[in-house]
Amino acid sequence: MKNMLLKDAEERMKKSTEKISEEFSHMRTGRPSPAILEEIKVDYYGVPTPINQLATINVSEDRSLIIRPWEKNMLSHIEKAILASNLGLTPINDGNVVRLNFPIPTTEQREKWVKLSKEIAEKGKIAVRNIRRDVLKEAKEMEKNKEMTEDDLRRFEEELQKLTDKYVEEMDKLFEKKKKEIMEF
């Protein structure tokens, strides 16, 4: 039973880490990345559709994304969806492709993004600690109901703390990686 609780805790902590990693991938950093467009939906004949299902998205060498729709009539729809997304980018429609230029961010913008990244990582750490709290509560209930001995509970707490430390450290690593990505130019 103890192992099942640990396994459940690890699974939930891993999901929290993956969610934070995904949030970081959608964050704007000043560097062109197709991932920034993944959440944007375009009205495709009445159906909200992700841009990457309507076009190819390439990173060009001049700090821009090139969006080449498979149907030319989608250019204006893609342009409108990007403008509505509040990414802070202005799409340029040249009749064949939509181009998104990524200007070099100011130091102030980068510091703001680092602060936002830190908040996201902190949110992830809080989620991991909440998982620890919930699982520990279950284990203490088991000990109270004589399903687990006091010694088993103590060992369980130590193992759970190691697991928690591992995933909190993982959140810190994700943040440091994102911070480095934001600040490097």
UniProtKB/Swiss-Prot annotation:
It holds the Pfam family RRF. SUPFAM superfamilies: Ribosome recycling factor, RRF (SSF55194). The keyword Zinc does not apply. Coiled coil: none annotated. GO terms for biological process: translational termination. GO terms for cellular component: cytoplasm. Signal peptide: none annotated. Keywords: Cytoplasm, Protein biosynthesis. The keyword Cytoplasm applies. It is found in: Cytoplasm. It comes from the Bacteria. GO terms for molecular function: ribosomal large subunit binding. Responsible for the release of ribosomes from messenger RNA at the termination of protein biosynthesis. May increase the efficiency of translation by recycling ribosomes from one round of translation to another. Belongs to the RRF family. This is Ribosome-recycling factor. It comes from Kosmotoga olearia (strain ATCC BAA-1733 / DSM 21960 / TBF 19.5.1). The gene is frr.
